[in-house]
A protein has these predicted regions:
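Short, charged N-terminal helix-start/capping segments
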Residues: 1-20, 139-157, 205
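Amphipathic interaction/junction segments at domain boundaries or subunit interfaces
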Residues: 74, 78-80, 85-182
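Hydrophobic transmembrane alpha-helix bundles
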Residues: 3, 50-61, 82, 129-142, ...
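N-terminal, charged low-complexity regulatory/assembly segments
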Residues: 1-86
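Short terminal or interdomain "cap/linker" segment that borders an active site or interface and mediates
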Residues: 147-176, 180-182, 186, 190-235
Length: 235
């Protein structure tokens, strides 16, 4: 199979349909563990009420998220509501920990699906070169969708470096008063990439991100065996 024949080649980043059902199960189980069976229903009632309040209070931000797709809008409102209600009950730090654990559990399933890793690894040609091309096409699609602004793409053979200088998630969550939530995508990647990298002979380094205080997101994909020993510094 040719790389370009993959259904997600050149598509923006998003949770594929097959992951969404699994995601709901992960979220439900996490809420049940966190708040207990007796606390689950009141928590959900508050989250639904908070989602309605967010849509009434911030139609401009909801519309901006919706301009990038219905899925983006739904996730923006839902995550903000979950975080606010959990913060009222547990405090902001614990609320973020709760959502981060959900995102990182989902990442174990979403990252292989986003990259169609079984098919990608079996495509004609060098697996790492195909992985680079898949990333370039995906980042270009995200740039066109307005989700990210990609400043530069550098491919020197054994390393693909992509610098992202703006991120809609960071901007939207900051504007609505929940800047912590901009980090969820970063933490999703930290859990998800290790699941797929061996399949495409790659290593991942990202020393800084916008959501975690950097001037840009510095994505680096190396051919396996050529990356610096700095994985522990990934952001």
């Amino acid at each position: 199979m040719k790389l370009e024949e993959l259904s997600r080649y050149g598509q923006p980043l998003g949770f594929p349909r097959e992951v969404q059902t699994r995601q709901l199960g992960i979220v439900f189980n996490a809420m049940r563990r966190e708040f207990g069976l007796l606390g689950l229903v009141p928590f959900l009632v508050r989250v639904l009420a908070e989602q309605r309040r967010i849509r009434r209070a911030h139609p401009d931000l909801v519309a901006e998220a919706g301009g990038m797709g219905r899925e983006v809008e739904t996730e923006f409102v839902m995550l903000t509501a979950l975080f606010r209600v959990a913060s009222d009950l547990r405090g902001r730090e614990e609320a973020y920990r709760f959502l981060r654990e959900i995102f990182q559990a989902v990442a174990l399933h979403s990252m292989p699906a986003i990259y169609q890793i079984d098919q990608l690894a079996a495509c004609d040609g060098d697996p790492f070169d195909n992985f680079k091309r898949f990333n370039i096409a995906m980042f270009e699609a995200m740039n066109e969708a307005g989700t990210w602004t990609t400043e530069s793409v550098e491919d020197d053979g054994d390393r693909l470096r992509i610098k992202v200088t703006s991120c809609a998630n960071v901007e939207l969550f900051t504007a609505i008063g929940c800047p912590e939530l901009g980090r969820l995508g970063c933490d999703h990647d930290l859990a998800g990439y290790p699941v797929i990298l061996d399949r495409v002979d790659a290593e991942f380094r990202r020393p800084c991100t916008l959501a975690k205080g950097g001037q840009y997101c510095d994505f680096n994909f190396y051919r396996r065996g050529t990356a610096p020993p700095t994985e522990h510094l990934n952001r």
